Amino acid sequence: MARLVRLGGLGVFGALGLAACGADTPPYDSSLPLADGVWVGESAPDEEGAFGRSTVTVSGGKITGSQYVTVQANGSMKGEDYGKDSSGEIANRSAYRAAQKAVSAFDVYARDLIEVGVPADVDVVSGATIAHGQFLEAATEALTESQMAAERGRTGPAGGGSESGGPADG
C-alpha cells in the first residue's frame, strides 16, 4: 500500500509540473532555428505571487548566455535575503539554508541551459523544484519567442532588457 501511495504522489507532482507550463507557450522544438538577440520569458506566478524570469542570449543561432531569477510578489528578486524574516534576520537557520539552496540553483539552471540547449534537458536541483518548473516555463517562452522571430526573419537587438516574451531592447 505504501508503494501505491508513493507512486500516486509522483503522479500528482507530475501533473502539477505539466500544469505549470503556460498554456500560451507552445512546446519548444529544438530542431527549429533561433533568431539572434536577447530574449526574455516569464513563468506564471506561484501561489505566493512569485514568478520566474529567464533571459537568454542567442548568437549564431546558439544559446550563448542565460540568466534566471525569481521575482517575488513585491517586485524584489529572491537573493541573499530570501529566507530571512521581515526584519532581515535569520529566524530559522534551517529554513534559511533551504531557501538559499533554491536561490543557488538559479545559476545552475541558467548555466545548464547554455550547455544542453534545451530547457527540458536541464536537470532538477534538489530543493529547487518549484524554481525548476518556473525556469522551464520562462526559458521555453524566451526560446519560443526567438524561434517565432526566426520564422518571421527578424532578430532581436543585442543587450539590454525587454518586456516578457520578446527581444530585448538595446
Question: Predicted regions span which residues?
Answer:
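Bacterial N-terminal signal peptides that target proteins for export
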Residues: 1-9
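C-terminal motif of bacterial Sec signal peptides marking the signal peptidase cleavage site
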Residues: 17-20
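Bacterial signal peptide processing site
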Residues: 22-25
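Active-site- and interface-proximal helix/loop "cap" or "latch" segments in soluble metabolic
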Residues: 28, 33-36, 45-53, 57-161, ...
